[in-house]
A protein has these predicted regions:
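Catalytic core of DAGKc-family lipid kinases
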Residues: 1-98
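Hydrophobic alpha-helical segments that either span membranes
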Residues: 2-6, 100, 128-130, 138
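A residue-level signal for conserved active-site and pocket-lining positions in enzyme catalytic cores
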Residues: 34, 53, 100, 127, ...
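Short acidic/glycine-rich loop or secondary-structure boundary segments that cap or lie
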Residues: 50-53, 94-96, 108-111, 135-138
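ATP/nucleoside-binding phosphotransfer catalytic cores, i.e., glycine-rich phosphate-binding loops
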Residues: 88-89, 94, 119, 129-200
Length: 200
């Protein structure tokens, strides 16, 4: 995607010539993936606010970071947190959340880190629950994202897991690596270890 989250995490250069030189070294790394049925994600899957942003942004003509920020502002003014039931490796949690991100790698893209300690090859997904927060704390939430300290926010809860079931009240968008889709109000996610080799 335009945020290059996975590429940035893997250290793949954004410069085309440098990226080609890296490819020509032919050094590969194995990474995990998250699976929802037959669909895979390699970076982050999300439900809630970020999925609503992805859904809206997909239909926007104004792209790039500025367009994305504009979409965030438009969505956040009307967005309401939802109630979720999560089953993470057999333990059940009930949460009212602003959004839930299931992270294979630490960042969305553009160096915004939602799960600072996530790893693409540890055989685990990090379930990041962003609780309802006062709007006046939004600047601090953004600071945490770009300072790699989201896990230190009192409004963020991170639970590692291999098998995850998320049930939400009503219908709401879901995204897999930024691509919006509708998979119903209950999704089952599991990690598949060492699923893909990437030349980086």
């Amino acid at each position: 995607g335009s945020g290059n989250g996975l590429a940035l995490y893997l250290g793949i250069p954004m410069n085309e010539s440098a990226a080609l030189r890296r490819i020509n070294r032919f050094e590969s790394v194995g990474i995990d993936c998250g699976k929802i049925g037959e669909r895979c994600f390699f970076n982050i899957a999300g439900i809630g606010f970020d999925a609503s942003v992805s859904d809206r942004f997909a239909s926007e003509t104004f792209r790039g970071p500025v367009g994305y920020l504009r979409t965030i502002i438009n969505v956040i003014s009307k967005y309401k947190p939802k109630k979720y039931i999560l089953d993470i490796d057999g333990k059940v949690y009930e949460r009212e959340a602003f959004m839930i991100s299931v992270a294979n790698s630490p960042q969305y893209g553009n160096n915004a880190y939602i799960a600072p300690n996530a790893s693409i090859n540890d055989g685990v997904l990090d379930v990041c629950i962003v609780h309802k927060f006062p709007l006046y704390t939004l600047p601090m939430m953004i600071f945490h994202l770009f300072n790699k300290t989201a896990d230190q926010s009192e409004y963020v809860e991170i639970i590692p897991g291999k098998k995850i079931c998320i049930e939400q009240e009503g219908k709401a968008p879901l995204h897999l690596d930024g691509e919006p889709m509708d998979l119903g109000n209950k999704i089952d996610i599991e990690v598949q270890g060492n699923a893909l080799k990437i030349i980086c």
